[in-house]
């Protein structure tokens, strides 16, 4: 008996639907018919999208799509980090950093560069020892990453001849990425695109989906169904009746107001990073692209009404709220109890969502697709495959949820009800353990210093996504320091001397690259052929 899956039906287009179609088309080597049912009248969510570095290696390279090709088609720009602004000082939202008591500006970066090490101890721990002993007042991201100097100068992460200088991710227009991948999947992989609206889910006596009925009367039969219908979860939550686990007891923000803001690139340059600007009831993203930046104020409607949030957002950028077209979104925070139920797999917003504080949304999509391809079933839908897939998605999501909550919980801000309420939320045991590990001076998660092992291996990165460097960037950036230096360093004078050479090398590399790299604006103009 032939138990192979013959047809996969994907409900929903957008970024999640077309990434899924394109990836499965490649992974299944054209042995399975793939159909995307996309309602043309459903508006797409998103004003600017930010990503993480493995997007090219884990997704576009796998599809054989060169970086420059999709970047040109999707108005993409470069992202070297998230820059956090005013997460420690009280006050209303402002793109201009305030000043801390120690004289530093209230900013810190979470870059993608990997930490060097001396005697198998990451440079973060030598920096912490120096800082705690009063031997330096340099911030962690400045001392340990050459990328910070590059970003401060608004330089690009690549040379004009396109040689790579450092690690980076991307900003892009999500609707253009969806359109690009739709064209790729339909023309290169023979994916069938059905523009119609689903009206009914047909199931058998076991509760398995057998087909989707459309508004025009078509019956789309399939063996495996992928729900990319967004927050509505039309298959996983409605048809499969799988409960969505609300996690607003960990993360308070549940709404956003967004728009695109014109920008004079020639006068002001283009920033090669995403900005995260703390507000009185949440935070605002800024995603630079040529000629404009996408921006959105993420907030909790328990602490600000839609009108109040819109006014605060408008004031931040000097917008006229009466003459600006805003995109208002209310989102659910959390995940499905199970991402895969019977023969229905949820991907993207239909599966899980956390606010885009660390740009995890697109990553969640292709991580889920990667895991689906790895656990791809036959018609018996082996319980072990399904359960292991669900465990992978659950652990991926919960780890990111905890990492994001730490941003709020350990911020010293208590100037508004929103910031005070974040201190009253319960932390998961896993993040408590990481904080105690950090406070004791030990590395958090596996320290990663080998880019080939980390960025070149999706499985390794998936299981250690938020690295020791990530936790150091956030904890130290928010002013949370280890109680004491790593005790073992007291016995390693030669290693400390080696670390000093590494600190000097970081500064030297940063200075050299600032002098030799083009501005982000100039490189993007070259890439996009702008006159």
From Swiss-Prot:
Active site (UniProt): 79
GO molecular function: monooxygenase activity; nucleotide binding
Domain notes: Binding of tryptophan induces structural changes. Binding of substrate to the halogenase reduces the affinity for the oxidized cofactor FAD presumably to facilitate the regeneration of FADH(2) by flavin reductases.
Keyword tags: FAD, Flavoprotein, Nucleotide-binding, Oxidoreductase
The family this protein is said to belong to: Belongs to the flavin-dependent halogenase family. Bacterial tryptophan halogenase subfamily.
Residue(s) at site: Important for activity: 358
Subunit (UniProt): Homodimer. Monomer in solution.
Miscellaneous comment in the UniProt entry for this protein: The reaction between FADH(2), Cl(-) and O(2) produces hypochlorous acid (HOCl), a powerful oxidant. Unlike the mechanism previously proposed for the tryptophan 7-halogenase RebH (AC Q8KHZ8), which suggests the formation of a chloramine intermediate with a conserved lysine, Phintha et al. propose that the conserved lysine likely protonates HOCl during the halogenation reaction.
Name of the featured protein: Tryptophan 6-halogenase ThaL
Keyword Isomerase belongs to the record: no
EC number: 1.14.19.59
Annotated L-tryptophan binding sites: 111, 454-455, 461, 465
Effect of a null allele: Deletion mutant cannot produce thienodolin. Thienodolin production is restored when the mutant is cultured in the presence of 6-chloro-tryptophan.
SUPFAM superfamilies the UniProt entry points to: FAD/NAD(P)-binding domain (SSF51905)
């Amino acid at each position: 008996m032939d138990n192979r899956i013959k047809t996969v039906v994907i409900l929903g287009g957008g970024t999640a639907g077309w990434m899924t179609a394109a990836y499965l088309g490649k992974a299944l080597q054209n042995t399975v018919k793939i159909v995307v049912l996309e309602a043309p009248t459903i508006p797409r969510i998103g004003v600017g999208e930010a990503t993480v570095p493995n997007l090219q290696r884990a997704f576009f390279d796998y599809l054989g799509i060169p970086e420059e090709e999709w970047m040109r088609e999707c108005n993409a720009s470069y992202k070297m980090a998230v820059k956090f602004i005013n997460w420690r000082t009280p006050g209303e939202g402002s793109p201009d950093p305030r000043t801390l008591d120690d004289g530093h500006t209230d900013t810190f970066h979470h870059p993608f560069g990997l930490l060097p090490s001396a005697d198998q101890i990451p440079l973060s721990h030598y920096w912490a020892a120096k800082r705690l002993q009063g031997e330096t007042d340099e911030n962690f991201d400045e001392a340990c990453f050459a990328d910070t100097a590059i970003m401060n100068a608004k330089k690009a992460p690549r040379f004009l001849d396109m040689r790579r200088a450092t690690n980076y991710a991307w900003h892009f227009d999500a609707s253009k990425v969806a359109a690009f991948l739709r064209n790729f999947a339909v023309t290169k992989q023979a994916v069938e695109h059905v523009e119609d609206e689903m009206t009914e889910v047909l199931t058998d006596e076991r509760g398995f989906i057998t087909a989707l009925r459309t508004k025009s009367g078509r019956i789309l039969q399939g063996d495996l169904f992928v729900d990319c219908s967004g927050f509505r979860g039309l298959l996983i939550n409605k048809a499969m009746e799988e409960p969505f686990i609300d996690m607003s007891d960990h993360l308070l923000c549940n709404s956003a107001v967004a728009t695109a803001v014109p920008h004079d690139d020639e006068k002001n340059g283009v920033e090669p990073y995403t900005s995260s600007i703390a507000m009185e009831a949440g935070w605002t993203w800024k995603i630079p692209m040529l000629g404009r930046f996408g921006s959105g104020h993420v907030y909790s409607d328990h602490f600000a009404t839609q009108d109040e949030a819109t006014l605060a957002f408008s004031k931040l950028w000097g917008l006229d709220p009466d003459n600006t077209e805003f995109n208002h979104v209310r989102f659910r925070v959390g995940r499905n109890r199970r991402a895969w139920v019977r023969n229905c797999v949820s991907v993207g917003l239909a599966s899980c969502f956390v606010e885009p504080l660390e740009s995890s949304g697109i990553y969640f999509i292709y991580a889920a697709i990667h895991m689906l391809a790895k656990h791809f079933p036959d018609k018996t839908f082996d319980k072990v495959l399904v359960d292991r897939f669900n465990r992978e998605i659950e652990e991926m999501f919960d780890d990111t949820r905890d990492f994001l909550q730490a941003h709020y919980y350990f911020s010293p801000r208590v100037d508004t009800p929103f910031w005070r309420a974040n201190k009253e939320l319960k932390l998961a045991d896993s993040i408590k353990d990481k904080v105690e590990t950090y406070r004791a001076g030990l590395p958090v998660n596996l320290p990663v210093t080998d880019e080939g092992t980390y960025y070149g291996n999706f499985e390794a990165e998936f299981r250690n996504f938020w690295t020791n460097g990530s936790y150091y960037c956030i904890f130290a950036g928010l002013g949370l320091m280890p109680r004491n230096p790593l005790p073992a360093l007291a016995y390693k004078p030669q290693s400390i001397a080696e670390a000093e050479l590494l600190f000097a090398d970081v500064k030297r590399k940063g200075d050299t690259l600032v002098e030799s790299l083009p501005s982000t604006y100039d490189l993007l103009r070259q890439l996009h052929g702008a006159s």
